[in-house]
Amino acid sequence: MEEISDPKPNALEQVLPTVPNGKCTAPVQMESLAVDVQKVSGEAKVRICSCWCEIVRSPEDLTKLVPCNDFAEDIKLFDSDPMQQEAESSIGIPLIPKQVTMSHNHDHESGSEMVSNEVMQENHVIATENTYQKSDFDRINMGQKETMPEEVIHKSFLESSTSSIDILLNNHNSYQSGLPPENAVTDCKQVQLGHRSDDAIKNSGLVELVIGQKNVAKSPSQLVETGKRGRGRPRKVQTGLEQLVIGQKTAAKSSSQLGDTGKRSRGRPRKVQNSPTSFLENINMEQKETIPEQVTQNSILESLTIPTDNQSRTYNSDQSELPPENAAKNCNHAQFGHQSDDTTKISGFKELVIGQETVAKSPSQLVDAGKRGRGRPRKVQTGLEQLVPVQETAAKSSSQLGDTGKRSRGRPRKVQDSPTSLGGNVKVVPEKGKDSQELSVNSSRSLRSRSQEKSIEPDVNNIVADEGADREKPRKKRKKRMEENRVDEFCRIRTHLRYLLHRIKYEKNFLDAYSGEGWKGQSLDKIKPEKELKRAKAEIFGRKLKIRDLFQRLDLARSEGRLPEILFDSRGEIDSEDIFCAKCGSKDVTLSNDIILCDGACDRGFHQFCLDPPLLKEYIPPDDEGWLCPGCECKIDCIKLLNDSQETNILLGDSWEKVFAEEAAAAASGKNLDDNSGLPSDDSEDDDYDPGGPDLDEKVQGDDSSTDESDYQSESDDMQVIRQKNSRGLPSDDSEDDEYDPSGLVTDQMYKDSSCSDFTSDSEDFTGVFDDYKDTGKAQGPLASTPDHVRNNEEGCGHPEQGDTAPLYPRRQVESLDYKKLNDIEFSKMCDILDILSSQLDVIICTGNQEEYGNTSSDSSDEDYMVTSSPDKNNSDKEATAMERGRESGDLELDQKARESTHNRRYIKKFAVEGTDSFLSRSCEDSAAPVAGSKSTSKTLHGEHATQRLLQSFKENQYPQRAVKESLAAELALSVRQVSNWFNNRRWSFRHSSRIGSDVAKFDSNDTPRQKSIDMSGPSLKSVLDSATYSEIEKKEQDTASLGLTEGCDRYMTLNMVADEGNVHTPCIAETREEKTEVGIKPQQNPL
């Protein structure tokens, strides 16, 4: 064997293109290769042997060449198979294996020749005579465009693997004495395959990979941390070199190499099947995941080929040795026709030897497996078998494989990857008593050919079927329960009868609540819902008929299969041969299925097994005890329920026709037995009222069941209560306004209007006026009346003086009340009252004030507020209103006088009651109105100058602008609000008083009005009041001082008393300035 040294190793790269077809196969070619190398290198010495041609650059860097005879038979030169030829022809470019250097390791005891991806700056080439099949790399790279997963080892070239590929080396390790140091194989060039792949394969982790050995040395940095799970016990993960073999359906995945595959957010994890043939497909085609870093550039796994019989042997050398860690980090990637863009970084295994029966392990070599956050760790089985992915399930690890099979809730599913299903007789048994990280893997297997290898795939359909069976179990239980709780016809009848009886009881309780008199007859006046009571009675009637139908159905069911009457003799006995089953009609009898006769009234017999449920022999009652069929038992239960609820007396032998026979007869005749007798109605809608009917009195005097009688009996009682209240002077709470007929003539009620007051009075003042009018001057007792009573008389709904002697008529059908018309009438009345009060009360109050205190006047008097009325004008307006309502002029005058006297008396009484010392400081307001030619003068509220200036402005414009008001306020030292109130009061007085013009004229002529006293004893007052009113006022004139008459001069108090007349007017309160009150009264306009 000759040695050739090459001082120019870089020049050897020029030799590579000269190799025919990219291969070094024959010795002739090796000779030509040596010549070419010598020509290029110049100083290189070429030595040619039978099988090797090696170039070295110096004597110190020599590599021993192994003779061809030392190789295994299947590694020698052989032709490619048809599949490889087809792949080669399809690509058109021969595949050149990756740069691989062979180094002789003297320290390894097994003596195997190691192939490592070691490349230093020195480049060496070793040519072998074996040709490699390009189809092997086609399976890896052609059409796949996938990246190698991480943690898949720095692959030393597996020259002893099953594929025979001619290795063309660009770089050769010159170290003779063993494996290169760490980090010596980090930057390799990529060997181009037939076409470029998108991802470059970066492999790191396994520094040494020796095939064919029986020992596998492992260290913590070499093994994969597998089986980690966040929750639940870890999954059993089996790792091995079998997962690196291409050709199966499943691939080894790692969390740092592959994206998390098979993840499911909920439920149990999906089984991820990775085949060796799709090893690279699972990386790039399906996962499309980014390969993490921490991986050195890989030497190509040239040993990942199809495991055939001729390819299952390994290349061993006596002097081979495992390299140290990280020895394969700087290797150049050979380009195999396609160049990957992304790199797959694979780390994890530092040392791995396949093929031995024993696997040497140490704590630093074992996988950190089975870690769990809680609970005991899962037993993780790691071994070489998982590197051969024969099964559809893949070995998974937390650091190398994507976390597959994760479950968001619940404990994890047990994933068992059996060694036999992984394609070999591998026994992975964890040692007991040791930590989960120290697991022993017993492997007694050898690589088998593909022809002998049959993948045993788990049946997914079985798993799905098991899951479906688990889900169907509750359904079966529900069906069984339904069958057990199956209800027959008799049970339905019993249940329905119980429901009907319950509803009847409910409706009866409802009727009893309104039919009783209650304690001391208090329930007689209870409001009774007539329609609801009718509905309840109709409901009870219908339920009884349904109960009758249920008994009819029950008897019909019991009559099926009955024995004919002719079969019984005179004593009621029947021959046993004539007995047949009522259900099946058969007469066949066996010892275990005899016919049993019912002891009820149905005269039927049943087979033991025809009954539902079947009647067993041990449950048959003795002869002295009777046995009833299900139909007779149901009827007995129904009769018992009916008798207890409705207090009936029905027997078992009775027919269904006896059940509620009266109700059935009434229904047949179209009548309802449950009428409304004894239940008075509160229904106010008397649509059957006929005002022209001849027998109204007969209806009223009818029996107690009449609804109208009860209604009007209660109405008469209410009237009596009202009369009692009136006799005690208490106001009535009756406010029924819905019966007022505004178009009706109320001339007969004028007398009542004149004899009553609109306000409640507690004193006897001025009541003789009305008595004198009624009895022609005779003094009568005090008369107390209530405004409600008067209002009822005005509305035409009450004649209390008639008492019980007056005939009672049914209620009228009242039409809708015209409230607008009613409001107009009341408003006109109120205007008349205010006019009279404004003219006469000022005279009476001011006169009494003068008698008590002399001619003193108060600063609180307001000249601005002048309430006077023209009697002629108001009388004429009232006459017109009265004529519209059909009143006569005489009655109008009488009514007007009575109203005047009544209101005068009311105001005097009000002042007497509310008189206090606080009112003594006040004086009567100056009305400034001439009554019967008299004058009165007083100081104005704002002063004479201010009043005169305001009157001038009022004469110019009654509705001044705001700017004018502000100027007046600034001129007179008043507020804008005071000026506005003065104009408002003045406008109202101007509309309702005829003397405003004369006052304005007086102020224009600078004439100060003077106050004149009124002689109460003279004819001046009589000219205002008529004789009847005057006589009463003169009678009570002496008591005004003692009653505090002078204290009521405040206009606001007058307004409070007038407010009792109703909702027809409201007060307009002026502001208070320096404890001086100015009050104006304005009638409210029609709100409608």
From Swiss-Prot:
GO CC terms, sorted: nucleus
Predominant location: nucleus
Ranges for the Sequence repeats: 140-152, 173-199, 205-239, 240-274, 283-295, 316-342, 348-382, 383-417, 678-693, 729-744
Residue ranges, annotated region (2 X 27 AA approximate repeats): 173-342
DNA-binding region coordinates: 226-236, 261-271, 369-379, 404-414, 935-994
Lineage of producing organism: Eukaryota, Viridiplantae, Streptophyta, Embryophyta, Tracheophyta
Induction conditions: By pathogen infection.
Compartment(s) where it occurs, according to its Swiss-Prot or TrEMBL record: Nucleus
A matching Pfam family: Homeodomain
SUPFAM superfamilies for the chain: FYVE/PHD zinc finger (SSF57903), Homeodomain-like (SSF46689)
Name of the protein described by the UniProt record: Pathogenesis-related homeodomain protein
Residues in PHD-type zinc fingers: 578-635
Any Gene Ontology biological process: defense response
GO terms assigned for molecular function: chromatin binding; DNA binding; zinc ion binding
Family: Belongs to the PHD-associated homeobox family.
Alphabetical keyword list: DNA-binding, Homeobox, Metal-binding, Nucleus, Plant defense, Repeat, Transcription, Transcription regulation, Zinc, Zinc-finger
Biased composition (Acidic residues): 705-718
CDD domains in UniProt: homeodomain (cd00086), PHD_PRHA_like (cd15504)
Region (2 X 35 AA approximate tandem repeats (type C)): 205-274, 348-417
